[in-house]
């Protein structure tokens, strides 16, 4: 359960960083934006790992004996990518103070691509898939909701720190899985 909690927090950090950025630009209707962003990001973080999980099931015969290497590679790559983006300040989409639903959907998709890749590793947690998906999605909703409010109060200061922390957590989970299954 500790691994799932760490994974959920790490995967949600891109969404949290975007939520903080959205909140920093929000001039009014903060609660509505927080609910909307949390909803979009939470659902995307449930769906994308499911797609990754089913991709992993299809590839099981090919990667079954080296799954711990795959987990280390995928999570390590994603973690390093998040750290690089945080340190270089890369932003993929310009944010406005009133993002449309289509813009939020696009942001949710972009921020959940890492979750799809991480879905390949969900079987290694030894927990029911539905529980993992609900936990990851629910955690992302709550953290994104809070991120919008936090962004309103802190501006963009915390945005890159959230991505940096998420990257470190993903790398540590990958190393832990590798050590446990080697």
From Swiss-Prot:
Signal sequence, start to end: none
InterPro entries assigned to the protein according to its UniProt record, in alphabetical order: Mntp/YtaF (IPR003810), Put_MntP (IPR022929)
Molecular function via GO: manganese ion transmembrane transporter activity
Major place of residence: membrane
Swiss-Prot/TrEMBL keywords: Cell inner membrane, Cell membrane, Ion transport, Manganese, Membrane, Transmembrane, Transmembrane helix, Transport
UniProt-annotated location(s): Cell inner membrane
Membrane-crossing segments per the record: 2-22, 37-57, 63-83, 104-123, 127-149, 162-182
A GO CC term assigned to this protein in UniProt: plasma membrane
Function of the protein: Probably functions as a manganese efflux pump.
PANTHER family: MANGANESE EFFLUX PUMP MNTP-RELATED (PTHR35529:SF1)
Protein name from the UniProt record: Putative manganese efflux pump MntP 2
Annotated organism of origin: Wolinella succinogenes (strain ATCC 29543 / DSM 1740 / CCUG 13145 / JCM 31913 / LMG 7466 / NCTC 11488 / FDC 602W)
């Amino acid at each position: 359960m500790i691994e799932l909690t760490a994974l959920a927090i790490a995967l949600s950090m891109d969404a949290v960083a975007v939520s903080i950025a959205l909140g920093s630009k929000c001039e009014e209707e903060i609660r509505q934006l927080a609910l909307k962003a949390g909803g979009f990001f939470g659902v995307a973080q449930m769906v994308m790992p499911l797609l990754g999980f089913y991709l992993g099931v299809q590839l099981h015969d090919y990667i079954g004996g080296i799954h711990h290497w795959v987990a280390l590679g995928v999570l390590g790559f994603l973690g390093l990518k998040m750290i690089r983006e945080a340190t270089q300040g890369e932003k993929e989409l310009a944010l406005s103070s009133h993002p449309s639903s289509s813009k939020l959907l696009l942001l949710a998709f972009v921020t959940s691509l890492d979750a799809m890749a991480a879905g390949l590793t969900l079987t290694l947690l030894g927990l029911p898939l539905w529980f993992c998906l609900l936990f990851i999605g629910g955690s992302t909703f709550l953290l994104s909701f809070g991120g919008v409010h936090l962004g309103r109060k802190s501006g963009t200061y915390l945005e890159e720190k959230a991505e940096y922390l998420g990257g470190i957590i993903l790398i540590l989970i990958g190393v832990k899985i590798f050590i446990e299954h080697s």
